[in-house]
Structures are given as C-alpha cells and as structure tokens.
C-alpha cells in the first residue's frame, strides 16, 4: 500500500498498530507475575529488578537462555498457542535451578511472520503462566514482526532467565561423591527436546495425524506432544535452601547419556537402573515405530525423567517424601560410583 508517493512500513509487512494492540492484550498477564524487586511497569527500554542486597552475603547471579525448538511446529499445526510459553520458561528456569539458583526474573523473545495480536497474547499468557509456576517475574521482552523471514502462521520463541544463589551454596559438582543416591523426578512427556526425531518418525514415516487418538497414549498425539515441560522450581527450591541436595541434572537435549556427566566431578560416574522407573508410552511408541536404537533414545530423550537429584543416602528417604508431598513422582534410580564422569546403565543399552 502506498501513502502519497512513498511506501509505508505497513506496506512492507510490519504493522505497528497491531504490535501496540498485542502489548495491550498481554499487559495484565505480565503484571500478574510481578514479585518483590520489580521496579516500574511495562514499556521501558529495559526491565528493572532490585536485588535486596541485605538478604545475601555473597550473591551470585545465574543466567540461562533457551528456546522451544521444533515443538513449535506442533503448536502451528494445531493452532494452539496457550501453553508453548510454559515450555520456554521451563527450559530456562530448570537450567538455572540446577546451579542452585532461585529464579528472579524472565524475559522473552518472540519473532513472528505476521503480527496477530490475539495469537501473540495467547503465547505471552503461556509465558506468564510459566513464570507464575517458577515464582519469577516477567519483566520485559521483545516481539518482532519479520515478514518474509517467517511464514505468516509461524514464529520463534526463546527466553532468558536470571536467578540468584549464595556463592557458598552454588551447586558446581564439588559436593557429589561416591555412595550418594540418585533420585529421578518424572517428566511430563517429551518436554522440549527430540521433536525433530519424534515428528519425523510419527508424522512422516508412520503418517499419524496430530488429531489421531492413540490407545497407548490415551489421548490424541497432538495433546501428548504439546504437553508442557514440567517446571521443578517449587518442589526443589526449599530442599536447596536446606542444603539437602548435592547435585541436580536437567535432562534436556543429550538425554540421560550426556546431561548427567555435566554435573559430575572428576572421579565420579552415575549408575542408573533402567528397571527403577517406568518409561512413558510415548517414548516406546517412537522407538518401536521408528526402529530407533536404544542408545539413540537415551541420548535424545529424557525417557521419563526430567530431573535427577543427588542426595546423601541418609537423606534419600525424607527428600523423596518431601518431593512427593510437593506433587512430584519420584523414583530411586541409581547411585554415584567411582568412575570417569559417565553414565553406566543397568541393564546396559543395546
């Protein structure tokens, strides 16, 4: 569209008015996440958060960033956008939690092919819900309209979380030693990893539709795949503050093979008993349908465990009970053994 003799930004595909409308629609969702420390309101060039210095002796800020990956393709196909923001928050806050940090605030980055205010508001409402579950404030973000870069019905979503921990309470692997017990917290499904493989196997090779109800899942494939990533902050944080947790591993890309070694000190390995927790049907479906090797499954997916928790043997019972009381499904899945920073599975992977 031409205004007078020149082109407008709207003619190039960027609708500033629609962007402003999206901001108005999301404001109340965002404000409901505010916690003590938040300064100002929406609309500033930067989000503001005041750290209460008197509460800490040597505070360390812990930052994490992540995206949702190709799980977004499922949201596009189903035109369901209200929970994908929870995934963006979960991937970030669970990561900083494993360092011992309490999440303080979050920022999101949303890039869209076409600014549809109602859709953007639904996405951000999901981000706000994730922040509420994690106890952190959504203090800012960016929504960029990028015509010609993304299709009109597509977008990308990423986030950035910042938390705080006392320097002496940082979880850096130094508290882990042989003889400690490993607890596994159940995942809610695939979380936000392995979707390129899952989509290839289930949607392309098997030809399933997202609307198809599969008996082994007890719901539609789309509902299973869109299940939000579980956020573990509320259940784990009190135990961290009491010093009962010696190590945490967020099971994301790399699965149970590559993530646990990231937290292990030299001289330690994990032995995990694969018979000690139930593998959800979705993973068995992917493995059987795609003839995916067992080792590939354990390197790609969480296989039913979203977080590993390392505790002293003497504390294992009460930590398990506390986590269960907080709503987690908890399994005693293994132990720390002498080794070379790797995971040993019993029985071994085929």
UniProtKB/Swiss-Prot annotation:
It is an enzyme of class 6 (ligase). It catalyses: 2-formamido-N(1)-(5-O-phospho-beta-D-ribosyl)acetamidine + ATP = 5-amino-1-(5-phospho-beta-D-ribosyl)imidazole + ADP + phosphate + H(+). It is found in: Cytoplasm. Its main location: cytoplasm. Pathway: Purine metabolism; IMP biosynthesis via de novo pathway; 5-amino-1-(5-phospho-D-ribosyl)imidazole from N(2)-formyl-N(1)-(5-phospho-D-ribosyl)glycinamide: step 2/2. GO terms for cellular component: cytosol. GO terms for molecular function: ATP binding; phosphoribosylamine-glycine ligase activity; phosphoribosylformylglycinamidine cyclo-ligase activity. GO terms for biological process: 'de novo' IMP biosynthetic process; adenine biosynthetic process. InterPro entries: PurM-like_C_dom, PurM-like_C_sf, PurM-like_N, PurM-like_N_sf, PurM_cligase. Its EC number is 6.3.3.1. Belongs to the AIR synthase family. PANTHER family: TRIFUNCTIONAL PURINE BIOSYNTHETIC PROTEIN ADENOSINE-3, TRIFUNCTIONAL PURINE BIOSYNTHETIC PROTEIN ADENOSINE-3-RELATED. This is Phosphoribosylformylglycinamidine cyclo-ligase. It comes from Moorella thermoacetica (strain ATCC 39073 / JCM 9320).
